[in-house]
């Protein structure tokens, strides 16, 4: 009789054989990704090479510590992997030092806070209602609980960052750390001006480039490398890698602090299979094809924004410099939640999003956030995004007219045709 361990480790035994419930859930998710248009700005389609690395035997290896200084034996090959990830990341962003161990962008930010701040210190970040991220000092987040959080905003008229307000708040509150970054800001950031303001109050400047990393690597968005004391990012989104985080800098002293903050400060053993997948993604991003891809990502976002505006929809800031397009639904008297639910039923996934100075609850919102990275990976071009804008408008008009169930059914068939023309995996 075969014992359990023999059955589990028999190479002939697949996931389907061992755990059909999980297998079927994964298969259903694959079919969802294949049959829907993924317009969530923080999502992308990782390559098979990235996923192969993440599903590798490195899953089995515990490697607490850093290269050459592990607390476990048998780490010579995972050292090779981590070293490649670091070298490639530094080359990608033209920096000297990198930590590739953070499990997420949020933990990368926490590592910076642990490196530079003590509880009660003042930080200055973009308000979440104006496009900032939870970890930039939002009240429900630890960054808003541990530190005195001052939030800057955007200009009410243009919806662009109000750098004069950033400077005024910095001079008034003397923050120890200024954060330049966002999760829902479609335009370019003036990292040079941020650094000038930071220098005036002797503050550190953290650039959180989680959304813009791929664009920066490809030269389609300004790089903070010359200006920020320290930079954090995720490795998925526009970098098209596994879900994870990184911290990079040109300052050796800050790098050493980050090393200690990540381990042993915040984490134990790194996820070596994920670090391997990060390394693969960095290699992909260093290839000329990646620059061409990112160029199309930005072009497609501009086309999407323009097409939505032609339908009479209000696009925040009037356009985009990135992969992000934000739509304000207040003129249509619709909520983000109502619209996103209808769009999903029609086969288009995006996310509800607060718009500047939104009075709706975060669970409802008055806007939508779209991103073009995933569907550009799929192969969609400008003309396809014009059609997608038409489909989005059809759904929104259906909501306004109260016949959205009929519209959703029609749009879903059109979405299926696009997806069939551009298959994934």
UniProtKB/Swiss-Prot annotation:
Top-rank taxon, per record: Bacteria
Organism listed in the record: Wolbachia sp. subsp. Brugia malayi (strain TRS)
EC number(s) per entry: 2.1.2.1
Functional summary from the UniProt entry: Catalyzes the reversible interconversion of serine and glycine with tetrahydrofolate (THF) serving as the one-carbon carrier. This reaction serves as the major source of one-carbon groups required for the biosynthesis of purines, thymidylate, methionine, and other important biomolecules. Also exhibits THF-independent aldolase activity toward beta-hydroxyamino acids, producing glycine and aldehydes, via a retro-aldol mechanism.
TM stretches of this protein: none
Modified residues (N6-(pyridoxal phosphate)lysine): 237
UniProt binding sites for (6S)-5,6,7,8-tetrahydrofolate: 132-134
The keyword Cytoplasm is annotated on this UniProt entry: yes
Protein name (Swiss-Prot/TrEMBL): Serine hydroxymethyltransferase
């Amino acid at each position: 009789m075969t014992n359990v361990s023999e059955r589990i480790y028999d190479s002939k035994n697949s996931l389907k054989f061992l755990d059909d419930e999980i297998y079927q859930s994964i298969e259903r998710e694959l079919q969802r990704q294949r049959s829907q248009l993924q317009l969530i700005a923080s999502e992308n389609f990782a390559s098979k090479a990235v996923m192969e690395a993440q599903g590798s035997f490195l899953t089995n290896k515990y490697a607490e510590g850093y290269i050459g200084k592990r607390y476990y034996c048998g780490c010579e090959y995972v050292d090779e992997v981590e070293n490649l990830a670091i070298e490639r990341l530094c080359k990608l962003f033209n920096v000297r030092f990198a930590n590739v161990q953070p499990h997420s962008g949020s933990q990368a930010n926490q590592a910076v806070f642990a490196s530079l701040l003590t509880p009660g210190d003042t930080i200055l970040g973009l308000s979440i209602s104006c496009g900032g991220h939870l970890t930039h000092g939002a009240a429900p987040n630890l960054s808003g609980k541990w530190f005195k959080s001052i939030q800057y905003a955007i200009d009410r008229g243009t919806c662009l960052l109000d750098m004069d307000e950033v400077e005024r708040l910095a001079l008034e509150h003397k923050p120890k750390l200024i954060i330049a970054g966002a999760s829902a800001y479609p335009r370019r950031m003036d990292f040079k001006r941020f650094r000038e303001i930071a220098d005036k109050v002797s503050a550190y400047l953290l650039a959180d480039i989680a959304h813009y990393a791929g664009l920066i690597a490809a030269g389609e968005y300004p790089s903070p490398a010359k200006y920020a004391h320290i930079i954090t990012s995720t490795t998925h989104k526009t970098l098209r890698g596994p879900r994870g985080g990184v911290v990079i800098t040109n300052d050796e002293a800050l790098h050493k602090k980050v090393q200690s903050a990540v381990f042993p400060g915040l984490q134990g053993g790194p996820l070596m299979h994920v670090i391997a997948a990060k390394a693969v993604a960095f290699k992909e991003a260093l290839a000329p094809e990646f620059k061409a891809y990112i160029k199309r990502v930005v072009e497609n976002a501009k086309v999407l924004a323009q097409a939505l505006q032609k339908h009479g929809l209000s696009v925040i800031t009037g356009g985009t410099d990135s992969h992000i397009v934000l739509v304000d639904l207040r003129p249509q008297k619709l909520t983000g939640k109502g619209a996103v639910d209808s769009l999903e039923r029609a086969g288009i996934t995006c996310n509800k999003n607060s718009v500047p100075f939104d009075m709706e609850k975060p669970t409802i919102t008055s806007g939508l956030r779209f991103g073009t990275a995933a569907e550009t990976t799929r192969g969609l071009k400008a003309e396809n995004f014009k059609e997608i804008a038409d489909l989005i408008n059809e759904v929104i008009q259906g909501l306004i007219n109260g016949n959205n169930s009929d519209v959703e059914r029609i749009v879903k068939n059109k979405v299926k045709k696009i997806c069939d023309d551009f298959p994934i995996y």
